[in-house]
A protein has these predicted regions:
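Acidic/histidine-rich, surface-exposed loop or edge segments in extracytoplasmic proteins
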Residues: 9-16, 39-40
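Conserved beta-strand elements of the Class I
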Residues: 5-7
Length: 192
């Protein structure tokens, strides 16, 4: 049987006060209202302090474990986004785009080197795991309300608001595992 499942992440405050205040957490009730009206059977939320990197990854894993072939999956992220220097040498522009969990810091320091940023390669792996579980008969829609989530609705170079500074990494600081180069989660995606 086809089940509708969702993960809703909303972050409006951060552990690090250097981040600007945003209202990602305020989006959650509106999204939940729509999902409930659409009769989603499983809805996982991850809000503010719950939305640490470990909390977000755990929520994705819980969702993935419950998914079955042909399910409909909706994933919503409202929060900060930031670019960091590419750590996997797989980005033409040399920048990774990141979701910013509650416990991620805006700038590198002696004690923080970006390990709490949720890098696009990691997000892609989490989404690929879900796609593999729901199969070709399933449907997945991902909505990202964050800076640096893409330029589909805005012109290149058009600054609206948000974080312009790039999180600078030193290659010896971080080691993330990632999927094979040139693998694209969207290559097998079906129309919603």
């Amino acid at each position: 049987a086809q089940t509708k499942r969702a993960l809703v992440i909303g972050i409006g405050k951060q552990e690090d006060s250097a981040w600007n205040k945003i209202n990602g957490d305020k989006d959650v009730p509106y999204v939940l209202e729509i999902l409930n009206a659409a009769k989603y059977g499983q809805i996982i939320t991850c809000i503010n302090e719950e939305a640490t990197k470990a909390g977000i990854v755990s929520a994705f894993q819980t969702l993935t474990q419950s998914c079955q072939p042909n399910d409909i999956v909706y994933i919503h992220y409202s929060g900060h986004g930031q670019q960091m220097r590419d750590i996997g040498n797989d980005e033409a522009d040399t920048l990774d785009e990141c979701w910013i969990p509650y416990d991620a810091y805006r700038k590198p320091s002696d004690t923080y080197r970006g390990e709490k940023h949720l890098v696009d390669d990691e997000v892609n792996m989490l989404l690929t795991d879900i796609r593999n579980k729901i199969g070709s008969g399933g449907k997945m829609l991902v909505v990202v309300d964050a800076c640096h989530s893409g330029d589909a609705t805005r012109g290149q170079g058009e600054t609206v608001r948000g974080v312009e500074d790039i999180f600078e990494t030193v290659k010896s600081w971080l080691g993330f595992s990632s999927i094979e180069p040139n693998t694209n989660i969207h290559s097998n995606a079906e129309r919603w």
